[in-house]
């Protein structure tokens, strides 16, 4: 069982394969050249226990054995991987996506992203669909390591920015075929921009940029969004969809969605 996830912006199209971990044995043969996978890895301790019980090896070992890891594969969470699994990720140059708020919500712990970054691994910042407000994800990424380790010195703001800005841009550049031009204002880069209405109360410079964002920015400051040169939001008004109509339709259909959900839960017992 496998689903094909199409990511598209105008003529930018790439595919990553998302699949259930139990179907690993057929994945290597199914993977076309130049494509990668997206999979959750060791989000909870139970994932590792289940893998050891059923297959006699840890989750990361199984992915490594079946050729799933690689420089075009994204592994989300990686909270409970051990040293050997970490070495597999590093050896294969696999992407790691840190999901702080999702991990907090599910009370599963936190990935050791500081040591991964120090070791030169490709750690990005995601949100597991929690919300689409990535600046709040910056904040939680900054705070979570301090709480987990009970040490206010943990998780430097520059490390948060490295994950969220530089590494995310590198991953997007690879996925959409723009290389190191993604996330930059340079010739031939994609025209993807947001305008932020931010009025700093103190000096705003490279020495405090991560903390200005972490403590001072919010999604409500975004006034305009441009994707591939096209305004998707202008002066805080969406240009391509009728927001009121979408909201009204959502209110209309959500009771049916919930009814199907409860019907499924009742069948599963």
Predicted regions and their residues:
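Histidine/acidic residue-rich metal-binding segments in metalloenzymes
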Residues: 1, 6-95, 106-123, 180
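Conserved active-site and cofactor/substrate-binding residues in soluble primary-metabolism enzymes
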Residues: 21, 58, 84, 108-111, ...
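Short, acidic/turn-prone active-site loops that include or flank metal/cofactor-
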Residues: 43, 100-105, 128-130
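Short secondary-structure transition/capping segments
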Residues: 50-51, 109-111, 136-139, 208-209
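His/Asp/Glu-enriched, well-ordered alpha-helical/loop segment
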Residues: 65-72, 113-200
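Thr-Gly-centered strand-to-loop micro-motif
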Residues: 75-77, 98-101, 125-127, 196, ...
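Glycine-rich nucleotide phosphate-binding loop and flanking beta-alpha elements
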Residues: 81-82, 104, 131, 202
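Active-site microenvironment of metallo-dependent hydrolases
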Residues: 165-269
């Amino acid at each position: 069982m496998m689903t094909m996830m199409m990511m598209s912006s105008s003529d930018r199209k790439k595919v990553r394969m998302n699949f259930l971990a139990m179907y690993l044995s057929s994945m290597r043969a199914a993977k076309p050249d130049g494509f990668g996978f997206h999979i959750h890895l060791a989000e909870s301790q139970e994932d590792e226990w289940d893998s050891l019980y059923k297959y006699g090896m840890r989750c990361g070992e199984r992915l490594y054995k079946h050729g799933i890891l690689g420089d075009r594969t994204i592994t989300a969470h990686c909270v409970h991987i051990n040293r050997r699994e970490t070495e597999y990720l590093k050896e294969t140059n696999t992407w790691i996506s840190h999901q702080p708020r999702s991990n907090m919500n599910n009370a599963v712990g936190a990935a050791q992203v500081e040591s991964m970054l120090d070791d030169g691994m490709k750690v990005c910042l995601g949100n597991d669909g929690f919300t689409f407000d990535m600046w709040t994800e910056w904040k939680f990424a900054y705070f979570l390591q301090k709480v987990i380790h009970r040490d206010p010195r943990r998780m430097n703001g520059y490390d948060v920015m490295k994950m969220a800005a530089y590494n995310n841009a590198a991953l997007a550049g690879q996925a959409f075929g723009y290389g190191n031009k993604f996330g930059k204002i340079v010739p031939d880069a994609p025209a993807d921009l947001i305008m932020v209405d931010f009025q700093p109360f103190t000096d705003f410079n490279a020495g405090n940029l991560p903390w200005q964002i972490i403590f001072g920015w919010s999604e409500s400051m975004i006034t305009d969004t441009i994707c591939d040169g096209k305004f998707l939001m202008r002066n805080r008004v969406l240009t391509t969809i009728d927001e009121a109509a979408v909201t009204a339709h959502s209110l209309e259909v959500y009771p049916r969605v919930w009814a199907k959900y409860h019907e499924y839960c009742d069948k599963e017992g």
